[in-house]
Amino acid sequence: MARYIGPSCKLARREGADLSLKSPSRALDSKCKLEQRPGQHGAVRKSKLSDYASQLREKQKVKRIYGVLERQFRNYYKNASTKKGNTGENLLQLLETRLDNVIYRMGFAVTRPAARQLVSHRRVLVNGKLVNLPSYHVKPGDVVALSQRAQKYLCVQESLTIKDQHGSAFSWVEVDSEKFSGVFKAFPDRADLPSDINEALIVELYSK
């Protein structure tokens, strides 16, 4: 299946949630009515879903937040289920260690799609080596940096400014904005991750 490149508002309305697909400096457009489904005459969202529908919607929401396709997501789940500890938390940790997500968390890009572009266009180095795979998994202690060319991008500089204005610092990454680099210090704890994600529903869905 091809990656979705349409309006981000449509996805947000489909899931009834802000998927962080727009810059924090731009609130969701007033036309983006999250309580209604996509379409000019989108029906108002039902207050109660079946268990299966709730599980499916949660999976779709998380896939869209992290920009992962179905096959990738299923592989992440299989990997998470073989690790020690809570499968749902393991799944979120795997998603958080994707290089595109780390670039986003460090504040070098305002959205994950923008971070994915930086990686795909060969503008990111890990431990001094060029990496162009958005799905590359960063490990604790890895140093992530932007190329000299990327450091001059206005979008990168604006993103760092937005990060400072919103105070969006994360405890598991340490960023040196002046050097356009950061260290992935540790795997994030569940308490550090978004509370609006219910990973237990995803585990229930795949456990059937």
Swiss-Prot record:
List, alphabetically, the SMART domains matched: Ribosomal_S4, S4
Q: Which UniProt keywords apply?
A: Ribonucleoprotein, Ribosomal protein, RNA-binding, rRNA-binding
- GO BP annotations listed: ribosomal small subunit biogenesis; translation
- Alphabetized CDD domains for the sequence: S4
One GO term describing the cellular component: small ribosomal subunit
Q: Which GO terms describe its molecular function?
A: rRNA binding; structural constituent of ribosome
Per the UniProt record, one Pfam family is: Ribosomal_S4
Q: Which InterPro entries match?
A: Ribosomal_uS4, Ribosomal_uS4_bac-type, Ribosomal_uS4_CS, Ribosomal_uS4_N, S4_RNA-bd, S4_RNA-bd_sf
Q: Does the keyword ATP-binding apply?
A: no
Q: Which residues form the S4 RNA-binding domain?
A: 97-158
Q: Does the record's keyword annotation contain Cell wall biogenesis/degradation?
A: no
Taxonomically, the superkingdom here is Bacteria
Q: Which NCBIfam families match?
A: PRK05327.1 (NF003717), rpsD_bact (TIGR01017)
Family statement drawn from the similarity comment of this UniProt entry: Belongs to the universal ribosomal protein uS4 family.
What is the recorded function of this protein according to its Swiss-Prot or TrEMBL entry? One of the primary rRNA binding proteins, it binds directly to 16S rRNA where it nucleates assembly of the body of the 30S subunit. With S5 and S12 plays an important role in translational accuracy.
Relate the assembly described in the record: Part of the 30S ribosomal subunit. Contacts protein S5. The interaction surface between S4 and S5 is involved in control of translational fidelity.
HAMAP family assigned: Ribosomal_uS4_B
Q: What is this protein called?
A: Small ribosomal subunit protein uS4
Organism per entry = Xylella fastidiosa (strain 9a5c)
